[in-house]
């Protein structure tokens, strides 16, 4: 009897592991939609993990449309880059569909600084120019993967990992990215650490970065 019970438990554990491996990707990403359409109702006051659905009678083709990716973003800023996002905020029809898009423009030597998307994997395609791109794995390895990519090349940034793009070429650069969430979110590392509101105390940051507090104060003053 004990042997039968042990065999049953082992089989149950194996089935559970198999189910988790088959369904882990679903659990870890945007939930699947349960109807054809769930266009975001921006006027709704309902608070859900996502956006409430608009009445199907009020849905129109414009809810699935965006115009503007043919236009270059304004790169006259300190980083020399601009992101034109196309997510559920711009296209309500993306609600529950688990995907979004963005155009990124880079001035000469422009940088999309180290950042993460907490809810999405990103795949990038270069349309013009050359980019030096990379991402860093999680602790404790913190391994850096980098590559120079050119027009027509594709690079993937795994979900949640810190990554960046730098205009490595001699002209302006343009890229299109797709992300595996209707609302991928962006955490720019420098802004989060040195520009939080309220500020993280300089005592904590000085110890974390092993520098004098005056150095931290100088950096925080820029954010």
Curated annotation (Swiss-Prot):
Disulfide feature: 38-53
Sequence ranges assigned to domain Cupin type-1 in this UniProt record: 67-217
Subcellular location: Secreted, Extracellular space, Apoplast
Function: May play a role in plant defense. Probably has no oxalate oxidase activity even if the active site is conserved.
Family assignment from sequence similarity: Belongs to the germin family.
Signal peptide positions on this chain: 1-28
Gene3D superfamilies referenced in this protein's UniProt entry, alphabetically: Jelly Rolls
A cellular component term, taken from the record's GO annotations: apoplast
Organism of derivation: Oryza sativa subsp. japonica
Highest taxon of source: Eukaryota
Record: glycosylation sites: 74
UniProt-recorded name of the protein: Putative germin-like protein 2-3
Database matches in PANTHER family: GERMIN-LIKE PROTEIN SUBFAMILY 3 MEMBER 3
Subunit text: Oligomer (believed to be a pentamer but probably hexamer).
Binding site for Mn(2+): 115, 117, 122, 163
GO molecular function: manganese ion binding
CDD domains membership: cupin_OxOx (cd02241)
Coiled-coil ranges (or none): none
UniProt KW keywords: Apoplast, Disulfide bond, Glycoprotein, Manganese, Metal-binding, Secreted, Signal
């Amino acid at each position: 009897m004990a042997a039968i019970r042990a065999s049953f438990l082992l089989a149950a554990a194996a089935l559970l592991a198999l189910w988790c491996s088959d369904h882990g990707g679903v659990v870890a990403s945007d939930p699947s939609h349960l109807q054809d359409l769930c266009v975001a109702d921006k006027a709704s006051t309902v608070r859900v993990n996502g956006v409430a659905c608009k009445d199907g009678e009020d849905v129109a083709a414009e809810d699935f449309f965006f115009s503007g990716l043919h236009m270059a973003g304004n790169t006259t800023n300190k980083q020399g880059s601009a992101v034109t996002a196309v997510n559920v905020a711009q296209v309500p029809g993306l609600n529950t569909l688990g995907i979004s898009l963005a155009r990124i423009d880079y001035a000469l030597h422009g940088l999309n600084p180290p950042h993460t998307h907490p809810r999405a994997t990103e795949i990038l395609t270069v349309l013009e120019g050359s980019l030096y791109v990379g991402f860093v794995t999680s602790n404790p390895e913190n391994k850096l993967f980098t590559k120079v990519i050119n027009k027509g090349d594709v690079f993937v940034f795994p979900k949640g990992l810190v990554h960046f793009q730098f205009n490595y070429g001699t002209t302006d650069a343009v890229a299109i990215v797709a992300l595996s969430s209707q609302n991928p979110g962006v955490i720019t590392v420098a802004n989060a650490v040195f520009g939080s509101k309220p500020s993280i105390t300089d005592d904590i940051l000085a110890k974390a970065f092993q520098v004098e507090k005056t150095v931290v104060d100088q950096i925080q003053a820029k954010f």
